[in-house]
């Protein structure tokens, strides 16, 4: 079968979940004997009001009569492409115009600005119409499916997939640190880790692996809270370093706000480590079972208590980590199974 994978591209950005998602799918389809082309159009804007122009570019892209048997779209606004047959596997929509609208910490769009409201209404209308053209709609999590139902009245089938380092992650000793992995930006809430550490009874260390716009602020906050000796900001680490950090962690702290899926949870479970997340973290809560394979905290104080529980009892961390590995095995399909689901009946 000739399959087109259609998605967006961030120029000069290497890695990232969306990039891996597209590359992983294309590689898996090719391994199964399909002929695959990946179509990417850069998505980004110098000004927030360029979002409609960016969306319109995708609607102008016509893949009909190109010989493609099926087009699989992944990310807004690739859903808008014209094709004889298309299916969506939705990573997420343009969240600044959806659940993050009117949240200044996560979105530049506000209901107090008429132009912003008009853009939001247009994108919601277009998403509903063009996703409605799909033969089938899949999502990468229940969280994304719930948003699609709430805002667009469309049903999506949650379809999980393996994380980037799935074949290479390994378990190791339960060391003296908790690990935080990801970009240092507002929606990942790295500041919550520092708030919690300041409240812990134990002197457990934290290693932060990642870079982003909040890096300097995080370093200043650690100093202000007297945590300099307990918080190590590693910056951007290599894949091998990340694998080693997962292997040696006591637990992984992952508290994003309404995350779509969250590879960190899955990677931690593959490394046999428990995960501490938040009740409003979205995707991670689809996997983390409170008191079974991790903890689901509700505020900085309960996050601190969860960190202390693992710091004081490495056997508990080991039991929860083993349960996390079992959760992964029960929940996450192989890439072959993912491809079979996406192409079923095509």
Which role fits each region the language model picked out?
Residues 236-237, 244-249:
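Short alpha-helical donor nucleotide-sugar binding micro-motif in glycosyltransferases
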Residues 274-278:
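Short hydrophobic beta-strand element within catalytic cores of glycosyltransferases
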Residues 168-201, 207:
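Conserved donor-binding/catalytic core segment of Leloir-type glycosyltransferases
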Residues 257:
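Aromatic "clamp/platform" in nucleotide-sugar-dependent glycosyltransferases that forms part
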Residues 219-237:
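Nucleotide-activated donor-binding/catalytic signature segment of Leloir-type glycosyltransferases, i.e.
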Residues 289-301, 309-315:
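Conserved acidic donor-binding segment of nucleotide-sugar-dependent glycosyltransferases
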Residues 312-345:
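A charged, aromatic-enriched C-terminal amphipathic alpha-helix characteristic of glycosyltransferases
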Residues 109-137, 145:
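Membrane-proximal helix-turn-helix segments that form the acceptor-binding/catalytic region
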């Amino acid at each position: 079968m000739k399959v087109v994978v259609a998605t967006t591209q961030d120029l000069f950005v290497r890695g990232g979940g969306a990039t891996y998602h597209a590359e992983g799918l294309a590689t898996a389809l090719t391994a199964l004997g399909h002929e695959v082309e990946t179509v990417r159009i850069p998505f980004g804007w110098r000004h927030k009001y360029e979002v409609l122009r960016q969306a319109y570019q995708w609607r102008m892209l016509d893949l009909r009569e190109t010989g493609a048997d099926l087009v699989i779209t992944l990310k807004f606004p690739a859903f808008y492409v014209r094709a004889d047959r298309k299916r969506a596997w939705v990573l997420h929509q343009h969240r600044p115009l959806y659940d993050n609208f009117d949240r200044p910490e996560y979105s530049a769009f506000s209901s107090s600005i008429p132009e912003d409201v008009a853009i939001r209404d247009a994108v919601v209308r277009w998403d509903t119409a063009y996703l409605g053209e799909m033969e089938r709609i899949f999502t990468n999590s229940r969280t994304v499916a719930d948003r699609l139902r709430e805002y667009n009245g469309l049903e999506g089938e949650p379809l999980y997939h393996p994380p980037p380092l799935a074949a290479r992650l390994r378990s190791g000793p339960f060391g003296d640190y908790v690990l935080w992995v990801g970009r240092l930006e507002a929606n990942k809430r790295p500041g919550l880790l520092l708030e919690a550490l300041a409240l812990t009874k134990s002197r457990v260390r934290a290693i932060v692996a990642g870079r982003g716009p909040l890096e300097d602020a995080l370093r200043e906050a650690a100093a202000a809270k007297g945590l300099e000796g307990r918080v190590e900001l590693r910056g951007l680490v290599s894949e091998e370093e990340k694998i080693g950090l997962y292997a040696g962690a006591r637990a992984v702290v992952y508290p994003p706000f309404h995350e779509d899926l969250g590879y960190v949870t899955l990677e931690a479970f593959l490394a046999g480590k428990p995960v501490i997340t938040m009740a409003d973290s979205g995707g991670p809560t689809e996997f983390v079972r409170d008191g079974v394979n991790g903890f689901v905290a509700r505020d900085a104080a309960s996050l601190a208590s969860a960190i202390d529980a693992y710091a004081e009892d490495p056997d508990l961390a080991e039991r929860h980590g083993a349960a996390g590995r079992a959760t992964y095995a029960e929940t996450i399909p192989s890439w072959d199974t993912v491809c079979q689901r996406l192409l079923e009946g095509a």
